Amino acid sequence: MMGIFLASVGFMFFSVLYVQQGLSSQAKFTELPRNVTATEGQNVEMSCAFQSGSASVYLEIQWWFLRGPEDLEQGTEAAGSQVELLPDRDPDNDGTKISTVKVQGNDISHKLQISKVRKKDEGLYECRVTDANYGELQEHKAQAYLKVNANSHARRMQAFEASPMWLQDTKPRKNASSVVPSSVHNSANQRMHSTSSPQAVAKIPKQSPQSGARIATSHGLSVLLLVCGFVKGALL
């Protein structure tokens, strides 16, 4: 009787363990991140969702940036498919952690959002899920590649900003002749008068104050003599 009881207990124990293992094996990604091609300046989203097959203590999603295009071989940049990877390397030395979300329950999802994507954002991204079950930690990974095409307008603006700028004074400038001092004009006029021909100078009679006085005196004497002549004639 005791043996039957022990056998029943053992059967139930192994049955529960088998069910737990079966449920754990059903843990999966319900939404895998997809490869994205964007143009510089656009907003980009990558989605990742996971469902645990058993009651978990907590679920955690981390988004990582692994490496840029210069670290990837030619021809494999956009050809990589969304494949769940096994943890085979040290995660702390694998790239740059971007964000973390942690929940209690069997389902978790998290979107990676990049605003105004730039060329340096291009590369391989990874969604890492940690399933904290009773007694053990399970890690699941999925990757996607972000390709960023150059924006011709943005490139032109960057080239314009990088080029030296020549500033032009828009203030109107005065005529060069108006800036010359008046003394310069006076000296120039004097030089012009001094270099004129002798014939032109000879045509302009010069009168001094003394000559004017002599002319006035002779004119007065002639008038006086004329008056005296009239008086003398009248007396005779």
UniProtKB/Swiss-Prot annotation:
Expressed in brain. Expressed in neurons. Expressed in adipose precursor cells in epididymal white adipose tissue (at protein level). Strongly expressed in adipose precursor cells. Weakly expressed in adipocytes. It comes from the Eukaryota. Residues 175-199 have a biased composition (Polar residues). Changing residue 175 to Q: Abolishes glycosylation and impairs secretion. Residues 1-24 form the signal peptide. GO terms for biological process: cell differentiation; cellular response to BMP stimulus; positive regulation of brown fat cell differentiation; positive regulation of gene expression; positive regulation of white fat cell proliferation. Induction: Up-regulated is response to high-fat feeding (at protein level). Up-regulated by the transcription factor PPARG in a BMP4-signaling dependent manner. Up-regulated during adipocyte differentiation. Residues 27-143 form the Ig-like V-type domain. Disulfide bonds join 48-127. Its main location: secreted. Residues 168-213 are annotated as: Disordered. Keywords: Differentiation, Disulfide bond, Glycoprotein, Immunoglobulin domain, Secreted, Signal. Pfam families: V-set. InterPro entries: Ig-like_dom, Ig-like_dom_sf, Ig-like_fold, Ig_sub, Ig_V-set, IgSF_V-set/TM_domain. Changing residue 35 to Q: Abolishes glycosylation and impairs secretion. It is found in: Secreted. Glycans are attached at residues 35, 175. Homodimer. PANTHER family: V-SET AND TRANSMEMBRANE DOMAIN-CONTAINING PROTEIN, V-SET AND TRANSMEMBRANE DOMAIN-CONTAINING PROTEIN 2A. This is V-set and transmembrane domain-containing protein 2A. It comes from Mus musculus. The gene is Vstm2a.
